[in-house]
Amino acid sequence: MAGREEDANLLYTVRIIKILYDSNPYPSGAGSRTARRNRRRRWRQRQHQVDALASRILQYRLGGPQEPPHLDIPDLSKLHLDPLDQPASTETGDNQLGTQPSNSA
């Protein structure tokens, strides 16, 4: 009956996480605009901490996420880079770079 043991483990983990989320209720709407904004900002900061803690609990209690399948990476010794073609220079392009056209007379 290994399935029941896994179910009990999952239910226990969900209870722990529910208690964790219940410990950080959404702030009330009373007070000035600035006070409400500050309470919501602090609540969001705590909520991010609760989210991180809940994911760590899930990872520890349930064995963590499954690893992705192994991807074949090509051999880096076969990697080569082709040289870039030189762009054709135009007179307006040279003037934009601050060079003067040469007068060979």
UniProtKB/Swiss-Prot annotation:
Residues 16-24 are annotated as: Homomultimerization. Disulfide bonds: none annotated. Transmembrane segments: none annotated. GO terms for cellular component: host cell cytoplasm; host cell nucleolus. A motif (Nuclear export signal) lies at residues 79-92. Residues 23-48, 62-105 are annotated as: Disordered. The keyword Transmembrane helix does not apply. Residues 69-83 have a biased composition (Basic and acidic residues). The RNA-binding motif binds to the RRE, a stem-and-loop structure present in incompletely spliced viral pre-mRNAs. This region also contains the NLS which mediates nuclear localization. These overlapping functions prevent Rev bound to RRE from undesirable return to the nucleus. When Rev binds the RRE, the NLS becomes masked while the NES remains accessible. Keywords: Host cytoplasm, Host nucleus, mRNA transport, RNA-binding, Transport. GO terms for molecular function: DNA-binding transcription factor activity; RNA binding. A motif (Nuclear localization signal and RNA-binding (RRE)) lies at residues 32-48. GO terms for biological process: mRNA transport. Escorts unspliced or incompletely spliced viral pre-mRNAs (late transcripts) out of the nucleus of infected cells. These pre-mRNAs carry a recognition sequence called Rev responsive element (RRE) located in the env gene, that is not present in fully spliced viral mRNAs (early transcripts). This function is essential since most viral proteins are translated from unspliced or partially spliced pre-mRNAs which cannot exit the nucleus by the pathway used by fully processed cellular mRNAs. Residues 87-105 have a biased composition (Polar residues). It comes from Simian immunodeficiency virus (isolate TAN1). Its main location: host cell. It is found in: Host nucleus, Host nucleolus; Host cytoplasm. This is Protein Rev. It comes from the Viruses. Gene3D superfamilies: 6.10.140.630. The keyword Nuclease does not apply. Homomultimer; when bound to the RRE. Multimeric assembly is essential for activity.
